[in-house]
């Protein structure tokens, strides 16, 4: 970037840009934010705005682009959405009073993880993550700058770090240490994260827990340092850090949550078709965020689960009160976001009016809960602090029809400030005085069309047409001449105008000052507002669970101290809702305390995967405090759920690979305990038949002998059903079918014992494969059944030569296949495997 012979303003731009090389610099110049040089060229393309140049006649004109300051947020949103950072440089003094170049400073750096003022309101959290490392220990901290939530945990390996980042759906990671090339490739390329670095620690430790492990402390303090460095202001809404461990909740990795469609449908990526979609009858943005959090982190503490269940039961028992409650919640705005706007100094009159409306709804919500007269609700009622003094202040101060822009006037309610009322009186009386002057001069001059108008340039003036110029009184003085008329003033009109303008200016300044004082006063209540937000959110989620329990015919599950599972006529609630009017066929799931594995056989499309997901979904719902879809349900409290479910039953899209199968299987057998739930669907199908069968059997035996976790294992390897005779904690079940007149009907019912035949050819028939192909498949099947595992003779070839292609021959010919053949995947970490695959893919 050339800096020779620059104007003072451009030199100022260059100096500031040097400090923020990784961000688009929006440089305030009057009513526009301007961008120059590479920023202008890139922004013009990304934002689809005009690219022009400064000093067009120079040898090297400077590329320039700009956006209006009043609509800048929508352009900032686009840049942030695409993963860029934006530095905002504001004018720090009035250009009219500036001596030399106007003083400018960067007042905020907006990044994907620090967005607080988006033009697209969203009820989702936007977490900014920080990770640091000390030896083999990782510290992971994260916060939401909008809600002020702040958490930290310690993790033992980088795979767990990546899993937690995926669960948080973070877009930006602040790094406190130098990544290895392998780690950077995973975070930046595979996970598509924006990476930022922070080596300094935040000195003010009042938000930190000094009992944290060193690496957790550094991750937290570096996150705070990064946030303060980019936001450049006091962030009084940030809550003290809360330490957690992933083992404190029902553990599920990202793949498990995706395969179960917990917060979004894996196929569409949308909310519809997920558990979140099913359970969301919340009425507030805060409640929606909390519900999503509960789904992500179900409980393992029976006492806390039962506490939630009891509130849901109270709401079910009080239908009319619950209806009043939901109506009252509709009047509640997003307190957490309003509190953050106060902290960031971005509150406008509309925000304060929304806050007052919300606070005025709290006594009604509290009264409804108190009216139910249930001790179970006491802890919720205690959180509903209406803060009446704050509601009274805002209601008394802010005019109901106040504009959104602070400087537009008309913000403060009449009667709140005596001096301001006097200024307003002058403005009102001035208008009357002007009307009186107009009438008086019209009568005295005899000019029937004489009237007083106003514009910013000439102020108030008498408008006289050319035909009436001969009747203009002598005390009129000319202010402007137009083609068909002239404009005049008088000393009296000028005096009144001066009084009015002075009153307006003083009124505007005083009104702004009063609003700033009110905003500062509101800032003193941030902690109480956040506590209130948490209370309202909890009430909202629990009433939502009650509504869903009622409309979806759910029942309260029971938890035993043993490992027995007994779900009578259970249903997959999401599938049932998606099916609508169609009849959903329930299934009973029973596993005695001494049964650890159900081996499930049956054809594709028969419902095996749905049956497996049904159990996992029921467990998640139960442990987050929801009622469940069944006639009755007795469950243990699981500490973790592990799944390996591919593209089955039209629930999850995408094709699995053998490598992913083995990695996910390894994750399960490495971390599962006897209190875990494991779901394996067709494990081993990604490799040769005997390899797959051998691996499947060995995994079953390992779980049976060394782990003892409750396991549903669906397989096409019918030979594995013989394990029931040798593994005492394994039982066979199958999906029932009805065969009649050569037609197979899937009954979608799980019954004891192994399946007697696959019905795979019937599935192929449903898929529309050619009739002659299906006939040939029937013939081959009959020969296989008669000859055991011996292959049938090939069909007679009509051509002279048939070429059989060997994969092993191809491996010798293609260098990438040769490299794959050399890999010892069983002695490699998942991270190493993924890294090798990425490198090989780049060579294709």
Curated annotation (Swiss-Prot):
InterPro entries cross-referenced by the UniProt entry: DNA_mismatch_repair_MutS (IPR005748), DNA_mismatch_repair_MutS-lik_N (IPR007695), DNA_mismatch_repair_MutS/MSH (IPR017261), DNA_mismatch_repair_MutS_C (IPR000432), DNA_mismatch_repair_MutS_clamp (IPR007861), DNA_mismatch_repair_MutS_core (IPR007696), DNA_mismatch_repair_MutS_N (IPR016151), DNA_mismatch_repair_MutS_sf (IPR036187)
Keywords tagged on the record: ATP-binding, DNA damage, DNA repair, DNA-binding, Nucleotide-binding
GO cellular component, one term: cytosol
Pfam families linked: MutS_I, MutS_II, MutS_III, MutS_IV, MutS_V
SMART domains associated with the record: MUTSac, MUTSd
SUPFAM superfamilies reported for this sequence: DNA repair protein MutS, domain I (SSF55271), DNA repair protein MutS, domain II (SSF53150), DNA repair protein MutS, domain III (SSF48334), P-loop containing nucleoside triphosphate hydrolases (SSF52540)
Any one biological process term the GO annotation gives: mismatch repair
GO molecular function term, any single one: ATP-dependent DNA damage sensor activity
Disulphide bond pairs: none
Annotated binding of ATP, by residue: 602-609
PANTHER family per the UniProt record, alphabetical: DNA MISMATCH REPAIR PROTEIN MSH1, MITOCHONDRIAL (PTHR11361:SF34), DNA MISMATCH REPAIR PROTEIN MUTS FAMILY MEMBER (PTHR11361)
Function: This protein is involved in the repair of mismatches in DNA. It is possible that it carries out the mismatch recognition step. This protein has a weak ATPase activity.
Family recorded in the similarity comment: Belongs to the DNA mismatch repair MutS family.
Full protein name: DNA mismatch repair protein MutS
